[in-house]
Amino acid sequence: LTPKSILEFLNKDGNILLALSGKASTSSAVSSLLLEIDIHLSNDRSSVVVDHFNYDTVSAAEKHDVLLLQRPGPLRPDVKAFFDGEGILALPRVAPQTLGSDSALVAPILRAPATAYAYNPKEEMPSAEDIEGTGSQLNVVSAMQARNSARFTVLGSVEALEDQWFSASVKAPGGKKTPTVNREFAKQLTAWTFKETGVLKVGKIEHHLATEGEVATEDLNPKIYRIKNETVRNSDSQSHACSITNCSV
């Protein structure tokens, strides 16, 4: 697959879930593809997110590269939350993403905590110059909804989808062991990406000239209107017409 063929798939209303890993360098082809939609990886494409305060003490006692995060809420109070809920997510070896400022079509789903930072783990003792980004400027999960409503979601931790993390028990520093909710979050993420949620499903549509009183059946849905006609349009919908950043509650 080439970036061109994947973009052509998106242009034909295809939806994509891309999972990355900080365990290995991301290919230049994937990096180039993400640049096309204004999602940026680290310069060396090998960075991983670590957090010395929000990590799993069971599996990452030394490297602190298994993030423990709450599920995300809505971006704004007037936006529907598709990924919220109770419980802790375990996200091993996250490949961080940052978003460009030129596109209103991309949005963060899950940001890194304020105490997190990204660096190349090949550097044993990272200096300030080695740090690729910090805090909420780093995205763990990002998404793009194109103008044709095609959806592209980037998950920074493919390991988070493995069976072992669906049924794992994790423990934050100073906390108690708790089961992960990776399975539930994966269902939410795939449901949004592949348009099982957040899609307007229009049923019955009626339109007619604006008049007082009852409208006769034969006056519904006329084929022609004049320029200055006032009209009324009614439709039945089953859901919201939603992107991540634009969905009324």
Describe the function of each predicted region.
Residues 1-249:
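Short, surface-exposed patches at the edges or C-terminal ends of soluble domains, predominantly
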